[in-house]
UniProtKB/Swiss-Prot annotation:
<dbReference type="GO" id="GO:0006777">
    <property type="term" value="P:Mo-molybdopterin cofactor biosynthetic process"/>
</dbReference>
<dbReference type="InterPro" id="IPR047594">
    <property type="entry name" value="MoaC_bact/euk"/>
</dbReference>
<comment type="function">
    <text>Catalyzes the conversion of (8S)-3',8-cyclo-7,8-dihydroguanosine 5'-triphosphate to cyclic pyranopterin monophosphate (cPMP).</text>
</comment>
<feature type="binding site">
    <location>
        <begin position="75"/>
        <end position="77"/>
    </location>
    <ligand>
        <name>substrate</name>
    </ligand>
</feature>
<dbReference type="Pfam" id="PF01967">
    <property type="entry name" value="MoaC"/>
</dbReference>
<keyword id="KW-0501">Molybdenum cofactor biosynthesis</keyword>
<comment type="subunit">
    <text>Homohexamer; trimer of dimers.</text>
</comment>
<comment type="pathway">
    <text>Cofactor biosynthesis; molybdopterin biosynthesis.</text>
</comment>
<feature type="binding site">
    <location>
        <begin position="113"/>
        <end position="114"/>
    </location>
    <ligand>
        <name>substrate</name>
    </ligand>
</feature>
<protein>
    <recommendedName>
        <fullName>Cyclic pyranopterin monophosphate synthase</fullName>
        <ecNumber>4.6.1.17</ecNumber>
    </recommendedName>
</protein>
<dbReference type="InterPro" id="IPR023045">
    <property type="entry name" value="MoaC"/>
</dbReference>
<keyword id="KW-0456">Lyase</keyword>
<dbReference type="InterPro" id="IPR002820">
    <property type="entry name" value="Mopterin_CF_biosynth-C_dom"/>
</dbReference>
<feature type="active site">
    <location>
        <position position="128"/>
    </location>
</feature>
<dbReference type="InterPro" id="IPR036522">
    <property type="entry name" value="MoaC_sf"/>
</dbReference>
<dbReference type="GO" id="GO:0061799">
    <property type="term" value="F:cyclic pyranopterin monophosphate synthase activity"/>
</dbReference>
<dbReference type="InterPro" id="IPR050105">
    <property type="entry name" value="MoCo_biosynth_MoaA/MoaC"/>
</dbReference>
Length: 162
C-alpha cells in the first residue's frame, strides 16, 4: 500500500486527481451488523414494528446513502453509480441483522466509501425505526469485504493480514 493520497507535499488535504486514471468497472462489497434484543429482532422478523417495514425502509436508506456519499465525506469524488444492491440477513443466534451492500460503477475511482456509507446508513435506519423499543442496539463489524477493479486490482478481506 502506498502513502496517504489525500495530502499534498505540504501536508494539506486535497481531493485526489483521478483525471489520468483509466475508467474500469469498479465493485465494492461492505458488510455490517446490528445486534438487538430478542423482542426487537422478533418485531423486525415478523414485520410488526410500529414504524412499518423496517428492512424495506432501511434498504431504500442504504441506497440513498451510497448515492450521497460525496456529500458526506469531504474528499470523496461524486460518482455515477451503476448498481447498489442491499441485502439483509436475519440472524436468530445474535439476535440481529447483517447488512451486505454491493456498489458498482464504471469509472476512475473505487466505490468502497459508497458501500461503507450504505451499510452504515442502512443499519442506522434500523436503529432509528426500533429505538423506541430497544435503545441498546449495537452497530458493529462494519468493513469492506471485497473490492474489484482499478489499478490496485482485486482484494478480499480474507486476503488481509490480521
Amino acid at each position: 500500500m502506498s502513502g496517504l493520497t489525500h495530502f499534498d507535499a505540504a501536508g494539506h488535504a486535497h481531493m485526489v486527481d483521478v483525471g489520468d486514471k483509466q475508467e474500469t468497472r469498479r465493485i465494492a462489497i461492505a458488510r455490517g451488523t446490528i445486534r438487538m434484543l430478542p423482542a426487537t429482532f422478533a418485531l423486525i422478523r415478523d414485520g410488526k414494528a410500529k414504524k412499518g417495514d423496517v428492512l424495506g425502509v432501511a434498504r431504500i436508506a442504504a441506497i440513498q446513502g451510497a448515492k450521497r456519499t460525496a456529500d458526506l465525506i469531504p474528499l470523496c469524488h461524486p460518482l455515477a453509480l451503476t448498481r447498489v444492491a442491499v441485502e439483509f440477513e436475519l440472524d436468530d443466534a445474535l439476535p440481529g441483522v447483517h447488512c451486505v451492500v454491493q456498489v458498482e460503477t464504471f469509472g476512475r475511482t473505487g466505490v468502497e466509501m459508497e458501500a461503507l456509507t450504505a451499510v452504515q446508513v442502512g443499519l442506522l435506519t434500523v436503529y432509528d425505526m426500533c429505538k423506541a423499543v430497544d435503545r441498546g442496539m449495537v452497530i458493529t463489524d462494519v468493513s469492506v469485504r471485497e473490492k474489484r477493479g482499478g489499478k490496485s486490482g482485486d482484494w478480499k478481506a480474507e486476503d488481509a493480514a490480521g
